[in-house]
Amino acid sequence: RTFAKKKGSGYLINGQKIWTSRAEHSDLLLLLARTTPIEKVKKKTDGLSVFLIDLRKISNKHIQIKPIRTMINHSTTELFIEDLYVEQNTLIGIEGEGFKYILSGMNAERVLIAAECIGDAQWFINQASNYANNRILFNAPISKNQGIQFPISKSYAHMKAAELMVHHAAEKFDSGINDGESANIAKLLAA
């Protein structure tokens, strides 16, 4: 839904994006926008371009950033872009090839998101354990009950298994192996 139209020595961008990570806390934004109308391309993924936008130089009237407050520890936003003019030098790579560039970074992003999810899980398990140990009912902490212990233990076991997969995927990435399977499994298990 975001289109960048050639204008002068640059592009005029209009549209909206949802599920954009950390835009409200960022100085720079990688923006994928359609530069060739969809009816003029063979595949839907053709005709997309990537732009590097310096948010510090953009007026709020051209980009509105609205937080989506649905997830703890994940600063997700929705962007509304209106008549944003950017120079040609903000284009990354070749016009129309942007989807390929974005795809090349997907595996790294999936491993990163999986690692964030592991951190979230550790925090929630710790919170649940502390609450169960400190909540006294009938003169004993509720953590003494199997009905409390088992779900926390099961969550911990799932988190540890996912953590191993995240480490495996990260090691492959660090070794220069672009392993989509490991990255996807890590994100699936950790999410």
Where are these regions (language model features)?
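Short polar/acidic secondary-structure junctions
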Residues: K5, T36-I38, T70-M71
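Flexible, small-/acidic-enriched active-site or ligand-binding loops
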Residues: K57-Y85
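Conserved hydrophobic/aromatic beta-strand scaffold that supports enzyme active sites
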Residues: R1-F3, G10, L28-L32, V50-L52, ...
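Glycine-rich phosphate/pyrophosphate-binding beta-alpha loops
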Residues: I18-E24, M71, A108-L112
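Alpha-helical interface subdomain recognition
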Residues: K6-L12, E78-D83, E97, S104-A191
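A short core secondary-structure module
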Residues: N14-H62
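Residue-level recognition of beta-strand microenvironments
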Residues: K7, Q16, T20-A23, I68, ...
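Cytochrome P450 core scaffold surrounding the K-helix E-X-X-R motif
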Residues: T90-E95
